[in-house]
Every structure is written in C-alpha cells, then in structure tokens.
C-alpha cells in the first residue's frame, strides 16, 4: 500500500506483485485507517477486486491496457463514475442515482485499466478549502488530526498520503487539488479539460 504507481507498474512488469495483491493491500489499508481520517464516502470492495483480477489476467498475458492498468485509483465524489452515485458531499443529492456513464477523466483512466476503489470525501459541492460536509463529516489531516487536510480534494490527498491508494482523481478550480496536496505532503496537478 506504500508503493507509488510507478513502483507498482515496475513490480507488475517484473511479476514481483500483481494488481490483485495491490488492490487487497489498498483495501486493507482503507479498513485500518479510514475510520480515523474519514477519507471515503463509498468503497466498492467487490468491484475493486473484480477489476484487479481482470487486470491481473491482462498482465499475465503481457497485454496491459495502458500505464495505469491495475493501479488502484480513488475518485473525488464530484466526478460521475459508472455504477456509483455522485453526491457532491451533500445531503441534497439522492444516493439512489448510480450513473450509467463516466466523466471524461474517469472514462480515460478506465480505458487504460485503472482499478477504481471508491469515492473520496469533498466539501459540500466542493466549494471551500476544507474537507467537511453535512453528508460525511470532517476529513482529518493524517499528520495532525486537529488540522484540516485542505479542500476540496482533502479526501483524495489524504488517501494518497496514507497509502489508501497511489493515485486519486480530483478537480481543481481554485486550489482544490493543490491546497490539500500542500497540506498533506503529496504531489498534485491542476488538471485541464
């Protein structure tokens, strides 16, 4: 669970680790730490393990789909993800509306074999630079739980900082990736569309 995406790819290529092992390690880390820092609103253990098994088969055949094949990835809970609800950190949205399509960045990662783990917490409608919401409560900074991890991608940054996955997908209009990354000591990029 402490390996970077690049290290995992090297291990997959060398058959020193498999996508299924990586997924199981990430899920175990989530089970150990999520209650303490409140990162995930949704964890899809069954889907994660199934996607990891499919990725493992591709790697064993020497046919990975791309540079993220088998890499565990979390998704900020504002990005549409096929089969999952997207609640925007709010009680105003219905949890009974799983989407039948992916947002473009989710679709691109899925096309290249990413293993999606779950949805990370965000501030309500990702509108402030702390990660708390009436839906999920407060996400804690992993290095000092009395401090904020920043926002609105605080859940994503804490997931990466604590080894609950090497990659997290977020959004950034006014610092929503950059602020949490600086508060938790991880690297983040403001994406373009």
Regions found by a protein language model. Name each.
Residues 45-68, 75, 95, 99, ...:
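Flexible, acidic active-site loops/lids enriched in D/E/S/T/G that coordinate Mg2+ and/or position polar
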Residues 67-105:
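Enzymes and membrane/adaptor proteins characterized by extended Gly/Ser/Thr/Asp/Glu-rich
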Residues 8-12, 55, 156:
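Generic hydrophobic alpha-helical segments
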Residues 1-50:
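An N-terminal boundary/leader segment
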Residues 99-193:
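Short glycine/serine-rich loop segments
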């Amino acid at each position: 669970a402490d390996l970077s995406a690049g290290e995992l790819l090297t291990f997959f290529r060398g058959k020193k680790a498999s996508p299924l092992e990586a997924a199981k390690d990430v899920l175990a880390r989530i089970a150990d730490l999520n209650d303490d820092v409140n990162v995930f609103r949704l964890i899809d253990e069954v889907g994660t393990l199934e996607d990891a098994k499919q990725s493992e088969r591709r790697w064993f055949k020497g046919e990975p789909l791309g540079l993220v094949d088998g890499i565990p990835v979390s998704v900020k809970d504002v990005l549409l993800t096929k089969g999952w609800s997207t609640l925007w950190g709010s009680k105003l949205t219905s949890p009974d509306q799983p989407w039948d399509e992916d947002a473009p960045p989710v679709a691109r990662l899925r096309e290249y074999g990413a293993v999606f783990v779950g949805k990370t917490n965000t501030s309500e409608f990702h509108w402030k630079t702390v990660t708390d919401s009436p839906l999920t409560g407060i996400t804690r900074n992993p290095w000092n739980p009395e401090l904020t991890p920043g926002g609105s991608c605080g859940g994503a940054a804490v997931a990466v900082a604590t080894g609950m996955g090497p990659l997290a997908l977020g959004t950034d209009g006014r610092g929503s990736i950059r602020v949490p990354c600086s508060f938790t000591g991880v690297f983040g990029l403001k994406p373009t569309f």
